[in-house]
Swiss-Prot record:
Residues 9-163 are annotated as: Required for interaction with SRP68. This is Signal recognition particle subunit SRP72. GO terms for cellular component: cytosol; endoplasmic reticulum; signal recognition particle; signal recognition particle, endoplasmic reticulum targeting. Changing residue 53 to I: Reduced interaction with SRP68. Diminished localization to endoplasmic reticulum. The modification N-acetylalanine is found at residue 2. The gene is SRP72. Coiled coil: none annotated. Residues 532-671 are annotated as: Disordered. It comes from the Eukaryota. The modification Phosphothreonine is found at residues 571, 618.
Length: 671
């Protein structure tokens, strides 16, 4: 290599500087020195390679890729496939990185490592799993722990996004990363309690490892723990403990972690908790899901879920056009997905356009028959909300894969019974029983449907139709006395002889008798307490003997208290129980008497005489026809007067209000 260079420094000396800076990790100075070498020889392959490495170490991936693409001819023999693919990977050009790796002349270990990362980002988990398995088996270096962590991450992704039951790879949970990935796999399988325990272990390991790492900054443990706490909050949310989950989510957001993917997921989960409540908070949180680079941090299903929730939030905030725009975009990306069309239908229903919503759902059902069941269930729900039960039943019966299910049969029979369409309800039973007869004969669901059909027919008086069902049940279990009794009851109306013949199969009274130890019953003390039931005494009941009746009354009767001014020598007033104005010696008020009697009749007339002259006080003749709700009665004669205790005297025409005033002035009758 020719000597010379900038400022009289020789090229070997420059290379020595590059080597020294590289060992110290000072790639900025190393890059400057490499550029000096390239000024001397611009086509130096080693210098170009070093420049690319320095740029990558400094995070200048775009510049590094430009250097590689600019000097393609020079670097043809010394291929930089790994460096090029790595730059494309870090620039989120994943498809280009895959092509670069696949076109490489030689598949080195570091290219395989990168290949696994690229496959993971492309969500090709089966291929990715095979690559990492091969690397774990055949690699022997200090990065074995990282490879196992990546392998467990692939298993967790399969469990969550593809619902694949993870196989036991025998990975020991020695680090918090491995524990975290194991917990994620358990969440995908629905084992939430076990996942929470593993996450708590991951938290302990994380705190321990970070406390031992003296080089780590104070933000590092918070960032690592935030991911674990976020997953804990997600488990709490799945368990229905939304208040605890919400509190933990908000604590993480207050820490302001730099991971935009974590913030986006937490914000999305808070929005799902808020639903149609606290929409102002949801509007603030949705901004976190729009941060730059989020699309490169999350999986496709996570991004899709965030978009769905954005559409729902737009619907809850009455942004109809925004809701339609987002849901239409989602439908164009995934035409077969149910949620976009369901969101559009929900928006139409909020606008009271139920007919359009049903038409939209019907169109989707025709285009995607594989997803028609869920759509038709929604259509039936809308029909029921409109009060069109019969149409809803027709829609439900058109779902071939569900119409024989016990739950569907129950719903249809209930709705047909509500519509008093018993024949259609029986037809639903018949079709379901026939399906089980052909596919799952004598299964528990089959026999249960037969019994329910028989009970339903008996309930609505279809005993003749219930006979075949009861016979089938009795043949399955001849010892079922209840079914036999129902069968005999049904035959008694149709074929009495057959009912009589079947009654012979009933057990005898001797076999039905209970095996009871009579002596033990006789020797027992009997009931220690019997609750008395009170009842009304009717006129037909036999009277008790006078002595017994008086004796019981004397026992229950308490001695009354006499008033303080009681005088035993004075005879009590026999009319003391009557109100003052109803007593025979009552003469009315003295003050203002003439004033009150103005217009009441001729002067000198008594109250009794005035009542006889008053036509309104005379007994009216019976009506020619009874009033609605009452019987026609003949008026009683004046000699048969009801006692004053139950009827006011004829000479008391005053109003109720005046009576109350007089009672207050006259006082109650006393001794």
């Amino acid at each position: 290599m020719a000597s010379g260079g900038s400022g009289g420094v020789s090229v070997p000396a420059l290379w020595s500087e590059v080597n020294r800076y590289g060992q110290n990790g000072d790639f900025t100075r190393a890059l400057k020195t490499v550029n000096k070498i390239l000024q001397i020889n611009k086509d130096d392959v080693t210098a170009l390679h070093c420049k690319v490495v320095c740029l990558i170490q400094n995070g200048s991936f775009k510049e590094a890729l430009n250097v590689i693409n600019t000097h393609t001819k020079v670097l043809a023999n010394n291929s930089l496939s790994f460096e090029k693919a790595y730059c494309e990977y870090r620039l989120n050009r994943i498809e280009n990185a895959l092509k670069t790796i696949e076109s490489a002349n030689q598949q080195t270990d570091k290219l395989k490592e990168l290949y696994g990362q690229v496959l993971y980002r492309l969500e090709r988990y089966d291929e990715c799993l095979a690559v990492y398995r091969d690397l774990v088996r055949n690699s022997q270096d200090d990065y074995d722990e990282e490879r196992k962590t990546n392998l467990s991450a692939v298993v967790a992704a399969q469990s969550n996004w593809e619902k694949v039951v993870p196989e036991n790879l025998g990975l020991q949970e020695g680090t918090h990363e491995l524990c975290y990935n194991t917990a994620c796999a358990l969440i995908g399988q629905g084992q939430l309690n076990q996942a929470m325990k593993i996450l708590q272990k991951a938290e302990d390991l994380c705190r321990r490892s970070l406390s031992e790492d003296t080089d780590g900054t104070e933000e590092d443990p918070q960032a690592e723990l935030a991911i674990i706490h976020g997953q804990m909050a997600y488990i709490l949310q799945l368990q229905g403990r939304t208040e605890e989950a919400l509190q933990l989510y908000n604590q993480i957001i207050k820490l302001k972690p730099t991971d935009v993917g974590l913030l986006a997921v937490i914000a999305n989960n808070i929005i799902t908790i808020n639903k149609d409540q606290n929409v102002f908070d949801s509007k603030k949180k949705v901004k976190l899901t729009n941060a730059e680079g989020v699309e490169f941090k999350l999986s496709k299903k996570q991004l899709q879920a965030i978009e769905f929730n954005k559409a729902l939030l737009a619907m809850y905030t009455n942004q109809a056009e925004q809701c339609r725009k987002i849901s239409a975009s989602l439908q164009s990306q995934s035409p077969e997905h149910l949620l976009p069309v369901l969101i559009q239908a929900a928006q139409l229903c909020r606008e009271k356009q139920h007919t359009k919503a049903i038409e939209l759902l019907q169109e989707f059902s025709d285009q995607h028959p594989e997803n028609a069941a869920e759509i038709k269930l929604t259509m039936a729900q809308l029909k029921i909300s409109q009060g069109n039960i019969s149409k809803a039943c027709l829609i439900l019966r058109s779902i071939e894969e569900l119409k024989h299910k016990p739950g569907m049969v129950s719903a249809l029979v209930t709705m047909y019974s509500h519509e008093e369409d018993i024949d259609s309800a029986i037809e639903v039973f018949t079709q379901a029983i026939q399906w089980y007869q052909n596919h799952q004969p004598k299964s528990p669901a089959h026999l249960s449907l037969i019994r329910e059909a028989a009970n339903f027919k008996l309930k609505y008086g279809r005993k003749k139709e219930a006979i075949s069902d009861l016979q089938q049940l009795w043949k399955q279990n001849p010892k079922d006395i209840h079914t036999l009794a129902q069968l005999i009851s049904a035959y008694s109306l149709v074929d009495p002889e057959k009912a009589k013949a079947l009654s012979k199969h009933l057990p005898s009274s001797d076999s039905m008798s209970l095996k009871v130890d009579v002596e033990a019953l006789e020797n027992s003390a009997g009931a220690t307490y019997i609750r008395k039931k009170g009842g009304k005494v009717t006129g037909d009941s036999q009277p008790k003997e006078q002595g017994q009746g008086d004796l019981k009354k004397k026992k229950k009767k308490k001695k009354g208290k006499l008033p303080k001014n009681y005088d035993p020598k004075v005879t009590p007033d026999p009319e003391r129980w009557l109100p003052m104005r109803e007593r025979s010696y009552y003469r009315g008020r003295k003050k203002g008497k003439k004033k009150d009697q103005i217009g009441k009749g001729t002067q000198g007339a008594t109250a009794g005489a005035s009542s006889e002259l008053d036509a309104s006080k005379t007994v009216s003749s019976p009506p020619t026809s009874p009033r609605p709700g009452s019987a026609a009665t003949v008026s009683a004669s004046t000699s048969n007067i009801i006692p004053p205790r139950h009827q006011k005297p004829a000479g008391a025409p005053a109003t109720k209000k005046k009576q109350q005033q007089k009672k207050k002035k006259g006082g109650k009758g006393g001794w």
